[in-house]
């Protein structure tokens, strides 16, 4: 299968391994299939397949340059003993909603689903393409991607990981995870600014030809672990298919019944994977885009205008503290019938003016497939408390955003289609907020201390990923200005 840029010519294509290695297109666009694949499965098959089988099926569908053996071994390595639940994605039913738990991997967040797989794909892609250079994984993070990419690529030969995150813009647990990851090829550096500042600078560095020439001369090549990388996005399609199959298997729904998914959304990768699952034939009625107070996407889906010219909020759901959602570009490419000129024009408007408006036809398509809402910080805490009071089920702040917006949507529309909440992180990643929500009083601790405090309140057994946090001492945090990121990379790699 061939891949093209959302902003480039249909004739300028790459193979899947090339797209995975390159990460971001040279014109600033994102890689998408030249022809979206036809499903290689029947809907009734999904209830009979394990998560690993569905993951292998999806990867072989989108990345057919890899052999069956390469995909099988990649899946086995990605979804092995590092997961604390053998099913990989357990589904819990609470208060008439289904919670798709994506946080049972080593770093306690949904990013593990893709970032345990991406290093496997990257290794095999490098072998296929016979790349002699070391791969530099350059990534901006709002918290979870940094941790998960560092864990996934730790000590991988021929690969270095450089992560930039916003100072004060990640949770204490996320910070400790990044600063205590073990591996001699890992770096995490704070920038003075927010996630959008980090991501914007990363994109600029990716497209700086003179800097890339210096890298090449020193034996290095950039790639990315953000969901901008198609190798990171595709594995996420699997859990939508798996969840639907499990609901059929458990007789919660009948084969062919429609399902809604409420997705806590920041950079738009997770919900885009759901849209791709729908394009493959999964009976999804609505994808509900759930935002925190950085509600640029809520406004976009409700009025067709994307406008980043607004106050940036640091919230208790920090992984969603984003005003520029990169993967939305892939959706626009699809809804504009793969018109790369329209997409490039919209992205230029966003860069130059800070806003754009989609056509009436595209807005109609948005309304057909999506709904949107947001939750304030107080509503997040109230939702955690409400869900806990119902049957002692504990959710993290991001999942609470999804749950709150799902309920808001159902009350507004009366739509009683079965609802799946995409549960994106363990509550122990954000113990301060969860503790305050459940007890009504502030946590007296932060980080690991707050985990102990929350565990004392909740009881039960801590997962492997949570217990690992108690054993590691973090490195000293390094903080730089965003415009010094390129200089920092040069220093780390000792570029001549």
Stretch-by-stretch model annotation:
Residues 1-496:
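PLP-dependent amino-acid enzyme catalytic core
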């Amino acid at each position: 299968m061939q891949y093209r840029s959302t902003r480039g010519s249909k004739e300028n294509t790459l193979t899947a391994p090339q797209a995975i290695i390159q990460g971001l297109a040279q014109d600033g666009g994102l890689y998408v299939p030249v022809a979206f694949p036809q499903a290689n499965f029947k809907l009734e098959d999904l209830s009979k397949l394990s998560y690993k089988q569905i993951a292998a099926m999806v990867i072989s569908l989108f990345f057919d340059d890899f052999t069956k053996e390469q995909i099988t071994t990649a899946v086995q390595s990605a979804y092995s003993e590092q997961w604390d639940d053998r099913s990989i994605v357990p589904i819990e039913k609470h208060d008439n909603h289904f919670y798709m738990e994506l946080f049972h991997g080593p770093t306690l967040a949904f990013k593990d689903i893709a970032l345990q797989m991406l290093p496997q794909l990257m290794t095999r892609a490098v072998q296929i393409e016979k790349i002699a250079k070391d791969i530099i994984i350059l990534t901006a993070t709002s918290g979870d991607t940094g941790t998960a990419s560092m864990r996934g690529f730790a000590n991988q030969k021929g690969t270095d990981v450089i992560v930039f995150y916003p100072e004060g813009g990640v949770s204490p647990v996320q910070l400790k995870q990044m600063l205590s990851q073990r591996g001699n090829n890992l770096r995490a550096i704070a920038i003075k600014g927010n996630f959008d500042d980090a991501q914007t600078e990363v994109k600029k560095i990716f497209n700086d030809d003179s800097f890339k020439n210096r890298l090449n001369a020193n034996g290095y090549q950039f790639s990315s672990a953000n969901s901008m990388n198609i190798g990171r996005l595709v594995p996420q399609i699997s859990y939508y298919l798996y969840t639907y199959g499990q609901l059929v298997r458990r007789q919660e729904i009948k084969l062919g019944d429609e399902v809604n998914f409420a997705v806590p959304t920041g950079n738009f990768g997770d919900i885009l994977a759901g849209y791709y699952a729908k394009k493959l034939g999964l009976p999804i009625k609505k994808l509900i885009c759930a935002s925190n107070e950085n509600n640029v996407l809520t406004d976009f889906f409700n009025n067709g205008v994307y406008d980043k010219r607004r106050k940036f909020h640091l919230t208790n759901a920090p992984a969603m503290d984003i005003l520029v959602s990169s993967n939305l570009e892939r959706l626009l490419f699809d809804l504009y019938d793969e018109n790369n000129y329209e997409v490039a024009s919209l992205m230029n408007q966003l860069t130059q003016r800070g806003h754009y408006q989609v056509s009436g036809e595209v807005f109609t398509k948005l309304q057909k497939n999506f709904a949107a809402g947001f939750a304030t910080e107080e509503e997040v805490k109230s939702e955690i408390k409400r869900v806990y009071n119902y049957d002692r089920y504990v959710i993290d702040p991001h999942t609470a955003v999804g749950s709150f917006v799902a309920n808001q949507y159902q009350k507004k529309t009366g739509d009683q289609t079965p609802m799946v909440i995409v549960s994106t992180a363990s509550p122990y990643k954000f113990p301060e907020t969860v503790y305050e929500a459940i007890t009504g009083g502030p946590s007296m601790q932060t980080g690991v201390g707050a985990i102990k405090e929350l565990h004392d309140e909740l009881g039960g057994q801590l997962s492997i990923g949570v217990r690992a946090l108690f054993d590691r001492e973090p490195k000293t945090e390094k903080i730089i200005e965003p415009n010094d990121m390129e200089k920092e990379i040069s220093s780390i790699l000792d570029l001549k």
